Amino acid sequence: MISYKKAISLIKKNSITLPSKKISIEKALYKVCAKNILSPSKYPSFNNSAFDGFALSSRETKGLNSKKTKKFRILKTIAAGDNPKINTYKKNSTVEIMTGALLPEQFDTILPVEKVKYFPSKKNPKYIILDKKLKKFEYVRFGGEDYKPGNIVLKKGEQVQANHLIALAALGIKEILVKKVPKIIFFGTGNEIIDYRKKNIPLWKVRNSNNLYFSAFGKDLNLEIVDGGVIKDNEPYKLKKALQKTMRSDIDLFVTSGAISAG
């Protein structure tokens, strides 16, 4: 019998390199990435609002306080996905802006909606009233905060998870290179093994739990598992035949349980 350490060494020494193929990201969940995936662009691709509120120019709020207030005329409402272009901009103007909407070039800060004072009323707002100075870039989410061009989105050898897919889709990456899913056949061995579904079994027998466990464990790792059944100890020819058949098939790995000692 060889040691566990020696067994691992032999497995690594005789391991094979599985081929790679390009697939759509819709089919990539739990597959193993075959090469580093880099961001082709920055994300977000533009500066946008991190809050619902009003976009303003911080320069125009300079010197404001409770005794010195200013009205800002509401020009329009910009929701996420709207064209933010302002055809005619006048000093001391503002736009209502929703979370994720592109920040127009005339503005550089956001006043959250919870802090807004409307004029003449909230039901009929024409202006907002401000009584304090706003800092530049408050509540602004910058383009490239999540990813910059060339950043690693998915590493080689990493298993693709749901959080990777949302990033890949957001960056417009449609396909990635992944490793072929290993196909493994498993055989239980031993004269004592019988079907686990049998209700009453002889005292000297044991129910087959290994095949079910290996199949479930393999599927949990996104491996393709083939249940080869059970081969008796006194049927070595069947084991040999199964091994020969496997070598002629598309099976990548042949696994058996049992036979850990001289017996």
Predicted feature descriptions by range:
Residues M1, L18, V140, W204-N208, ...:
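Hydrophobic alpha-helical scaffolding
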Residues M1-I8, K21, I25, N47, ...:
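Generic structural signal for well-ordered, non-membrane alpha-helical segments
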Residues M1-K68, D108, K123:
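Short, low-complexity N-terminal leaders and the immediately following helix N-cap/first helix
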Residues M1-N14, I201, F214-G218, L253:
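N-terminal intrinsically disordered, low-complexity, charge/repeat-rich segments that act as generic
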Residues I8-K12, L29, L75, V113, ...:
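A generic alpha-helix structural signal
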Residues I25-L29, I184, N234-E235:
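A glycine-rich phosphate-binding loop feature that marks nucleotide/adenosyl-phosphate handling sites
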Residues A55-D227:
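Short, glycine/charged-enriched hinge/interface segments at domain edges or termini
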Residues N191, N211-G263:
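Short glycine/threonine-rich loop/turn motifs
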